[in-house]
C-alpha cells in the first residue's frame, strides 16, 4: 500500500541517517537548506539513529546541551521502530554481504533494513557505504538542493 501511495501522489519519504542529523545539528548549511527544501515531505529517522545520537551525546563534552538537542529532535521527527520485517531483512542483508566478502556495521544494516521495509529514501553522506545494498534508495543532503 505504501508503494502505491508514493507512486500515486509522487511523495518521496525520507529516513535521516545519523550522519545527516549530526551535520544538521552542527549547522551544515547544505543539510539545513535541504531540510527546508523538503519541509513538506515526510522526514523520519530510525530508533537506531537515536541510539547512536544518545551514545555520542553521553561521550561528548557537552552532555546536557546535546541531550536537549536530541529531545527536540525526537519531538520533531517520526521515529521508525525496528519491527519483525526489518529484523528479517537485516538478517538477509548481512548474509548476502558476508557471502560477497563485504561487511557493514550492524546498526547501519538495521537502518538500511528499516528504510527498505518502509520504502524510504535513506539520506546519508555515506553513499559508498550503503550503495552495496540492492534496492536501497539514497540521497545526500550535504549538497545544495536544485531549485
Residue ranges and their predicted role:
Residues 1-45, 55-72, 144-147:
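Short, well-structured N-terminal submotif of metal-dependent ribonuclease cores
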Residues 20-21, 49, 86, 128-129:
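Alpha-helix capping/helix-boundary segments
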Residues 27, 125-128:
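Short, polar loop motifs at secondary-structure junctions
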Residues 47, 83, 126, 142-145:
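Residues at the C-termini of beta-strands that transition into short coil/loop
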